[in-house]
Amino acid sequence: MATINANFNKLASGYLFPEIARRTALWQKRNPGVAVMRLGIGNTTEALPPAVQRAMKEKIDKLGDRRTYTGYGDEQGDTYLREAMVEYYKRWGVTLEPTEFFISDGAKSDAANIQQIFGPDNIVAVQDPAYPVYVDSNVVGGRSGSYNSERAQYDGFVYLTTSEEGDFIPTPPTGKVDLIYLCNPNNPTGAVSNHQEVKAFVDYAIANKAVIIYD
C-alpha cells in the first residue's frame, strides 16, 4: 500500500505567506476603509525594461520558426547565458567556468530542492528570522522533530537567533551542525553581514566540515 511522507504532518498550520494573506483579509474585513501597508511577499511593481522585452520577443520569434527552433535547452541552462555570466563576473575579478552555473526558476525552488542531496541525519542550523522555505523543506526532508508551539520552533533544528540589539546579524553555532542556511541580505530584516561576519561562518564550516547554503 502506498503511504505518504509522514513528515508533512509536522508542518505548522500553513505556509507563512498564505497565512499572512488570510489574516490580512480577515483584519481588513473587520476594519473597512483602513489602508494596509503590505510587507509580505516582495512582489514586482515595475514593467519589464525594453531590452528584456526585445530579447524575449527575439527568442520567441526564433522558436516560432522551424529553421531556428532549438528544442529543449541545455540541462544546466542555455550555454550562451552561462557564458555571459562568466563574462559578467570577470568585471569583479572573479574567474568562473560555465559549468559552475545552473540556471533555474529562482532561489526558492533551489533552496528547497538542494536539501535532497543531503542525508536525513544532518543537523541543520538556520538563521532566525529568515525565509521560511529553509525550515519547511528540511521538515519535509525528515531532519526535524515535532513543532514546538511554545517556542514557535521545530525541535531538532539549531536556530541562529538574531535581535535588533545585535543588528540582526547571526553568529556561528556553538555546537556541531552540518548544514547552515544563511540569508544575506536577510529576508525579512534587510540586515547585511560584512566580510568578517561571513568569514566567521566559512571558518566554522571548514573546521567542522559543514556546508553553507547561502541565499
Model-derived regions, located:
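Short, basic/glycine-rich phosphate-binding loops at helix/coil junctions
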Residues: 1-3, 181
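N-terminal small-domain helix-loop-helix segment of the aminotransferase-like
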Residues: 3-6, 10-105, 113
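Residues at helix C-cap/C′ positions in short coil/turn segments immediately following an alpha-helix
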Residues: 32, 208-209
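Conserved core of the PLP fold type I
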Residues: 65-208
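Generic enzyme active-site microenvironment
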Residues: 213
